[in-house]
């Protein structure tokens, strides 16, 4: 959102909605609520929006083929809206640990019905390996008193990722 105007985002949302039914529809992938400074900056750029996610929602950019990276600083209302639109989170633990962005709350996302799939975040991560990404995800959850079983990790990296991609 930071690199686009409201008009540009609305135009992108219009295209996304317009072609949603053709050949399976378009995908939309972007970042959301990765770190606190970014969230504050988006609030300054889009003062009429309730939250960072709301910027995308108002522009028609949340669909079942919308994949939003990070989502660390989403609130309950944001997670509820993501579930309503069937949008997914690309959980990027390696990047988030490396950059000190914060800890993604998988339990809250899951409880809200938001799909989560692990992602390497090649631009900010330390590895493209999904197994290393899952290992970092395990650590992120453990730091919050949450648990990722081997089955949850396997599901997230396979079927969960396919769900996020609407396959």
Give short role names for the model-derived ranges:
Residues 1-88, 100-116:
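Histidine/acidic residue-rich metal-binding segments in metalloenzymes
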Residues 34, 93-97, 121-124:
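Short, acidic/turn-prone active-site loops that include or flank metal/cofactor-
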């Amino acid at each position: 959102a930071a690199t686009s105007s409201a008009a540009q985002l609305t135009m992108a949302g219009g295209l996304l909605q317009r072609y949603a039914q053709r050949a399976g529809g378009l995908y939309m992938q972007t970042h959301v609520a990765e770190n606190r400074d970014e969230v504050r900056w988006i609030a300054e750029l889009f003062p009429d929006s309730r939250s960072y996610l709301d910027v995308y929602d108002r522009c028609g950019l949340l669909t079942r083929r919308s994949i939003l990276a990070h989502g660390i600083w989403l609130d309950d209302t944001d997670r509820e809206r993501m579930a309503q639109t069937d949008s997914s989170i690309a959980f990027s633990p390696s990047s988030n640990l490396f950059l000190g962005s914060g800890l993604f709350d998988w339990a809250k996302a899951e409880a809200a019905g938001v799909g989560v799939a692990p992602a390497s975040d090649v631009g900010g991560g330390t590895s493209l390996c999904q197994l290393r990404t899952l290992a970092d995800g395990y650590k992120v959850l453990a730091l919050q008193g949450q648990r990722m079983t081997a089955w949850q990790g396997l599901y997230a990296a396979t079927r969960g990722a396919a769900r996020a991609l609407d396959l």
